[in-house]
Amino acid sequence: MRTQMALSGGADLVIEMAIYATASAEYFATAGIGILDQLGCVDYLSFGSEWAEVEDFSAYATLFLEEPEKYKQILQEQLKSGKSFPEARAFAAGNLLFDSKPEKAIEFLKEPNHILGLEYIKALQRRNSFIRPVVIKRKGNHYHENKLTENYSSATAIRQEMYHFYRNFSRKNPYNTETCNSGKCGNTGKNTNNRVSNIYNNTYNKEKDAPQAFEKALCGEYLPFIEGFLQNNFVTWEDLMPYLDYTFLLKNKVIGKYFGMNLDLARRFQNIYEPGLSFEDLIEGLHARQITDAALRRVLLHIVLHMKYYPFLEEAKDIPVPYARILGFSKSSSPLLKEIRQNATLDIIQRPAEGKKLYSNGSAQAQIYSIDIRTADLYEQIAARKAGRKPISEYKRQQVIR
């Protein structure tokens, strides 16, 4: 569904990020840049920025890659004082880059888009890549803004509004899928944000019109995705608890070897865990100043997926992803596909079965690919069970062509 939405939004080609999407921003960026660089035909990388320029990202990236002695000294002092690593890193960077004014670095490094953008630049510098970075600065609402406004609402606000409509209206006024699919709602797939803003401003205060207004703004080809999202047919963190329970019941002796897990965290997990805990209860019990809740979620996901340091960590040092799996493409992208096949220095997979043939020798690549397929199958099985349908094997998944 995401591939369909990306293609309908104007993308020519959609490539899977594979299992590296479950890792931290550093590994996520390293894998993404590794794929793009090895395609052999990518000139530019664009990413979101709240307000910073490419030069700002480059300055931080160089500092964090080189780690001069003064930086390491301040970093250690701040860690010993009780600061978390992100706080200590921002303080040290601010002292070196802005003449002992850490507040500038703290402001920069607290933004999620800046953290990811910084890792993109670090990955480009580490690979000596010829790909040129380009920032797209945010317009409209801030990343964390939770209210719809006239121009460029945040994704957070849109998600919350979707929940609001479903909770208050959808059971009484279900979306008219037939009307939307017939094109009568006027959705052409263009300027969706403007339609949302206009309809929101004109009808939001009229409760009886609200569901119809939201339907008109977001129906058509987007409706199945929205309906599934609102009806909770997608996988949530809580859906993973039975798998964590099972892993713990096995009394796994190597829990400390899962990717992102350390011995201290493993001990806390074993001390806190008890049958009947919710996923959020577990996160709350594991919460510590030294690790973010997002990192905790990733670690627990890696336990569910049985992802250990090897081969994941070892492979990421050099070639983070040994293949690029194409999920979908537009009919007009044939020249791009041809250029990729001519220039790519990694395997190009268009059908999952191709990967099965390529990586059947027990190598690290084979293990990574099997984890990727297993992850997709697990997600599909949970989602299918919640939706009351039969799951589709990842090996039978077809490319999306638009």
What are these regions (language model features)?
Residues 17-184, 189-402:
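Active-site cores that bind ATP or allylic diphosphates and position pyrophosphate for catalysis
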Residues 1-2, 8:
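N-terminal catalytic cores of NTP/NDP-binding nucleotidyl/phosphoryl-transfer enzymes
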Residues 8-19:
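A glycine-rich helix N-cap at a beta->alpha junction
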